[in-house]
Design a protein with these regions (language model features):
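Enriched for short, Lys/Arg-rich terminal
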Residues: 1-6, 12-27, 59-92
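PIN-domain endoribonuclease scaffold, especially VapC-family toxins
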Residues: 24-38
């Protein structure tokens, strides 16, 4: 099964900010994770794990030491919605 990866408005802004910063290694890692999400959103690079308590249902994986990708998996519509690509969860 191949998932469709969709970016929230917030995640799109974060991606633009990363692109403007010019860190090609970080951008390559983000795009590689997008490709992994299409095939297996619960495993792969960046130690994916489901968050707990109030954030249950949201998944996270490390992009680098400073930034994490958070996303929601919608199995019923075969879609992964990326919520954030900046900071550590809600750090701004």
């Amino acid at each position: 099964m191949t998932y469709f990866v969709e970016l929230s408005d917030n995640a799109e802004e974060h991606l633009k900010t990363h692109a403007k910063a010019g860190n090609k290694i970080l951008l390559k890692r983000i795009y590689n994770i997008f490709e992994e999400l299409k095939q297996h959103p619960k495993t792969g690079t960046g130690k994916p794990h489901e968050l707990k308590y109030k954030k249950a249902g949201i998944w996270s994986r490390s992009i680098d030491d400073k930034h994490r990708m958070t996303y929601v998996i919608h199995d019923e519509i075969v879609t992964v919605l990326v919520i954030s690509l900046w900071g550590h969860y809600e750090d701004k």
